[in-house]
Amino acid sequence: MKVSVAALSCLMLVTALGSQARVTKDAETEFMMSKLPLENPVLLDRFHATSADCCISYTPRSIPCSLLESYFETNSECSKPGVIFLTKKGRRFCANPSDKQVQVCMRMLKLDTRIKTRKN
């Protein structure tokens, strides 16, 4: 009987602490996002950069710009530079920022963002 009460108490404590940790992480993410300097923000509400977003490798495929919704560049703390694109289907992938096609897509997305901003 004592073992089951102790186990139940432990389970309740772990559950409470786990949900609190998630709330804390969400609050930290929101705080970090509010401090990011964005010159021309092209990020959407459902797609945010965090300090942990770094590219380990680049996609070997050429992705058509028309399939892309937004992007952000990785920060200088990452071991290699990168551009993280978000597709219209919600997939994320890393690309090489020195690649000509990547630069074309980045310019196109910046232009699209400026046009949408002016219309609103």
From Swiss-Prot:
InterPro entries: Chemokine_b/g/d, Chemokine_CC_CS, Chemokine_IL8-like_dom, Interleukin_8-like_sf. High levels in adult lung, liver, skeletal muscle and pancreas. Moderate levels in fetal liver, adult bone marrow and placenta. The short form is the major species and the longer form was detected only in very low abundance. CCL23(19-99), CCL23(22-99), CCL23(27-99), CCL23(30-99) are found in high levels in synovial fluids from rheumatoid patients. Coiled coil: none annotated. The keyword Glycoprotein does not apply. Residues 1-21 form the signal peptide. It comes from the Eukaryota. The N-terminal is proteolytically cleaved by proteases associated with inflammatory responses. The processed forms, CCL23(19-99), CCL23(22-99), CCL23(27-99) and CCL23(30-99) exhibit increase in CCR1-mediated signaling and chemotaxis assays in vitro. The keyword Glycoprotein does not apply. It holds the Pfam family IL8. Keywords: Chemotaxis, Cytokine, Disulfide bond, Heparin-binding, Inflammatory response, Secreted, Signal. Disulfide bonds join 54-78, 55-94, 65-105. One of its GO terms (biological process) is G protein-coupled receptor signaling pathway. It is found in: Secreted. One of its GO terms (molecular function) is heparin binding. One of its GO terms (cellular component) is extracellular space. Belongs to the intercrine beta (chemokine CC) family. Shows chemotactic activity for monocytes, resting T-lymphocytes, and neutrophils, but not for activated lymphocytes. Inhibits proliferation of myeloid progenitor cells in colony formation assays. This protein can bind heparin. Binds CCR1. CCL23(19-99), CCL23(22-99), CCL23(27-99), CCL23(30-99) are more potent chemoattractants than CCL23. This is C-C motif chemokine 23. It comes from Homo sapiens (Human). The gene is CCL23.
